[in-house]
């Protein structure tokens, strides 16, 4: 019998579930209730935040903490952005760990390459521990996760190259990291009375006669325009992986891949700021995740493979080191663009993300090697032979086929599970050029009153990023952007505003 633990599952039913999956999670399953509504009249505030994902909510909450009146506008009917979809961990170095700060910064520079803006990166590293404590102050239940420094070898409590345990990883005590962060931010947003206007898209950011930001023009779902007057605007709209035209223009090598991001990641904020003369950087830099669920774009995170999962092709054979940084290319170029991820019950028991997906019915299950092989329609004898060989290599702790450096599971805890995976666009690392104060830059310098945080920015993490660094950057720069925007609004309030141009 073939099932996922929730009744008989055909491949057709699994595909149907995948189609519904991303929308269900993005809609905020398990999230705190938030008072949201569309904008129905003109308004005035100190700071407008565009986007209600992790960086946007962080910016809004930080601005409110600084005493600013804030309005958040979100074009989608739900909140959470990409952050609510996060299933891994974030990075945060505790106070009193200067060596850890040095190691994290050097590793991020090594990973990001020559395009990394070190001044921007240094602020992420130095602010990472405080960002974690700040989230905890709003109820996030987070705990350390010991990981190796090598991004390709992240696992529980391994040693650094210098013999010390890395203390940089931060995970939730229960559940998934994305909902945990968004929940905490929503608690803070509610306590500060910050309104979130969903189904409200920004048409343009306006400036006064001297080029200073003075508000936004928005559209509601009925196509009606409203204006929000504000001396400061924070752009936190995410990347552009869901915009096929922008992907084709800037990252042609990833054309045809699905996006793992929120459907809201259409590059709106980049385009809005470019119309104001903003600079962009690293627009070609895109990370591809090797193991995403077809149709839904949900990811099976790196840790699943670290903890022992393997990949097989339609012949039932392994074809690569599952921890290789080139795994996505190997799946796409050498294996018809897809593969089967194989794991066992022990891994589901240990990993909240697998438990969550299992409950949603994404996995095919078999009580033996042969039964699972028949379920996924690969040659049963060859699949069994592959697993027998792999288990023997685990026993010897040596992968003589592909040189996989970690062999943590024999995959013999029945039942066994499989899920079809393929590469997908995971992060667009290019975007708006900012300075360490999160001010958006033009060729002439900072655009007065305009700030940005999160995946809408570029140069922050370079051409590649460490696992967990994206969440950390979103929170650290969200806090900076919100605080700086509030300070600018307070300064502008002391002077008489120039006449608005509306454009």
What spans do the regions from the language model cover?
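Beta1/beta-strand and adjacent pyrophosphate-binding region of the FAD-binding site
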Residues: 41-55, 71
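C-terminal structured subdomain/cap of oxidoreductase catalytic cores
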Residues: 42, 59-62, 356, 430-492
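Glycine-rich FAD pyrophosphate-binding loop
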Residues: 65-84
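Glycine-rich active-site loop/strand segments that organize a redox cofactor
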Residues: 91-124
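Conserved redox-cofactor binding core of oxidoreductases
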Residues: 126-224, 243-246, 394-413
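A glycine-rich dinucleotide-binding beta-alpha-beta segment and adjacent secondary-structure elements
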Residues: 204, 382-464
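Glycine-rich loop(s) and the adjacent beta-strand/alpha-helix scaffold that form part
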Residues: 221-293, 477-480, 484
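An anion/pyrophosphate-binding glycine-rich loop and adjacent beta-alpha core
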Residues: 270-274, 278-382
């Amino acid at each position: 019998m073939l099932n996922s633990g929730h009744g008989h599952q055909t491949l057709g039913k699994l595909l149907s579930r995948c189609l519904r999956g991303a929308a269900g999670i993005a809609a905020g399953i398990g999230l705190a209730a938030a008072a949201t509504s569309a904008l129905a009249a003109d308004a005035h505030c100190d700071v407008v935040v565009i986007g209600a994902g992790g960086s946007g909510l962080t910016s809004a909450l930080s601005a409110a903490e600084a005493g600013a009146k804030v309005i958040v506008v979100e074009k989608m009917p739900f909140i959470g952005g990409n952050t609510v979809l996060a299933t891994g961990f974030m990075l945060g170095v505790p106070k009193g760990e200067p060596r850890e700060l040095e190691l994290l910064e050097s590793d991020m520079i090594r990973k990001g390459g020559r395009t990394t803006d070190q001044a921007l990166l240094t602020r992420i590293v130095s602010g990472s521990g405080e960002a974690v404590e700040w989230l905890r102050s709003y109820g996030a239940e987070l705990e350390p996760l010991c990981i190796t420094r090598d991004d390709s070898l992240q696992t529980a409590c391994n040693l650094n190259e210098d013999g010390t345990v890395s203390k940089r990883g931060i995970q939730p005590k229960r559940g998934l990291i994305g909902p945990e962060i968004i929940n905490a931010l929503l608690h803070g947003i509610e306590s500060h009375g910050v309104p979130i206007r969903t189904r409200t898209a920004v048409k343009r950011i306006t400036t006064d006669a001297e080029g200073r930001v003075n508000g936004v023009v928005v559209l509601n779902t009925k196509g009606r325009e409203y204006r929000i007057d504000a001396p400061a605007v924070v752009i936190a709209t995410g990347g552009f992986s869901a915009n096929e035209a922008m992907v084709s223009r800037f990252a042609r090598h990833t054309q045809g891949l699905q996006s793992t991001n929120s459907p809201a990641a259409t590059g709106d904020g980049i385009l809005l700021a470019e119309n104001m003369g903003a600079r962009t950087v690293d627009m070609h830099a895109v990370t591809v995740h090797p193991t995403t669920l077809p149709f839904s774009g949900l990811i099976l995170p790196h840790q699943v493979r670290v903890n022992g999962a393997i990949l097989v092709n339609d012949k039932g054979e392994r074809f690569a080191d599952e921890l290789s940084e080139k795994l996505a290319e190997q799946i796409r170029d050498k294996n018809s663009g897809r593969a089967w991820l194989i794991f066992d019950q022990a891994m589901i028991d240990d990993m909240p993300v697998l438990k969550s997906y299992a409950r949603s019915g994404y996995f095919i299950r078999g009580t033996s090697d042969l039964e699972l092989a028949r379920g996924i329609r690969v040659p049963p004898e060859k699949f069994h032979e592959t697993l027998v060989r792999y288990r023997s290599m685990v026993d010897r702790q040596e992968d003589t086929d592909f040189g996989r450096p970690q062999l943590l599971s024999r995959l013999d805890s029945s039942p066994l599970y499989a899920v079809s995976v393929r590469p997908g666009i995971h992060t667009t690392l290019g975007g708006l050029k900012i300075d360490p104060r999160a001010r958006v830059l033009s060729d002439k310098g900072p655009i007065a009153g305009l700030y940005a945080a999160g995946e809408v920015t570029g140069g922050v993490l370079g051409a590649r990023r460490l696992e967990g660094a994206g969440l950390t950057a979103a929170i650290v720069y969200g806090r900076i952007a919100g605080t700086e925007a509030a300070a600018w609004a307070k300064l502008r309030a002391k002077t008489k505003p120039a006449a608005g141009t509306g454009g």
